[in-house]
Design a protein with these regions (language model features):
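N-terminal helix-cap/turn-to-beta initiation motif at the start of protein domains
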Residues: 20-34, 58, 85, 132-134
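N-terminal targeting signals for Sec/Tat export/insertion, comprising classic cleavable signal peptides
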Residues: 30-55
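Edge beta-strand at a domain terminus
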Residues: 107, 128-166
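Short, surface-exposed coil-to-beta transition loops
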Residues: 48-52, 75-80, 99-103, 125-130, ...
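Short beta-strand segments that buttress and anchor functional surface loops
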Residues: 37, 65-71, 91-96, 114-121, ...
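Bacterial N-terminal signal peptides
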Residues: 6-16
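Acidic, glycine-rich flexible loop segments
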Residues: 102-132
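Predominantly extracellular/secreted and cell-surface proteins with exposed
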Residues: 58-62, 67-110
């Protein structure tokens, strides 16, 4: 085998294996989900109990998650995540905040996607938060968002939702 062919095989197959790994992982997040948790409408607000229902579909290296979370009569909000894996790197978008659609960028470690949420610039500075989307055992998923408190800079959990596959 020539050095060029060897180099090509080494370059292609690890990437193909990474895509296959991400496809298998994304399949664990596919399905109809329901659950509950707590959400803060902003980092300084008190947490509200919510119930959520989500529909998640994996298609190869892509994941679409759409649904809604409700806090009794206080609010109901549609939420959605669109992600695409490129090797071990993930990019996409998140909707569900009053700030508008945000960009998502991150990687996977084990059964957890670690994503940066980059909110749109609304005339001030762009704000960055984080989202962890985790496959927690068979038929369980957890979504956690964390962002800095605007006055103190302290990291605040703004959402923690535990979901079970229907």
């Amino acid at each position: 085998m020539t050095p060029a062919i060897t180099a090509l095989l080494l370059a292609v197959f690890p990437f193909s294996a990474a895509i296959a790994d991400e496809t298998v992982f994304l399949d664990t997040l596919s399905g109809n989900w329901h659950g509950s948790g707590q959400v803060r409408l902003n980092p300084g607000a008190v947490p509200l109990a919510v119930s959520c229902s989500l529909d998640s579909r994996a298609d190869g290296a892509a994941l679409n998650l759409a649904g809604a979370c409700r806090a009794k009569v206080v609010f109901s909000r549609r939420i959605g995540v669109d992600l695409r894996a490129n090797g071990t790197r993930y990019t996409g978008s998140y909707v569900g905040s009053r700030r508008g659609a945000a960009r998502l960028v991150g990687t996977r470690t084990g059964a957890t996607l670690n994503l940066q949420i980059i909110w749109p610039d609304k005339g001030t500075s762009s704000r960055v938060a984080s989202m962890r989307l985790a496959s927690v055992g068979t038929g369980h998923m957890q979504i956690v968002t964390i962002e800095p408190h605007p006055q103190t800079g302290e990291q605040v959990i703004t959402a923690k939702i535990e979901l079970t596959r229907n």
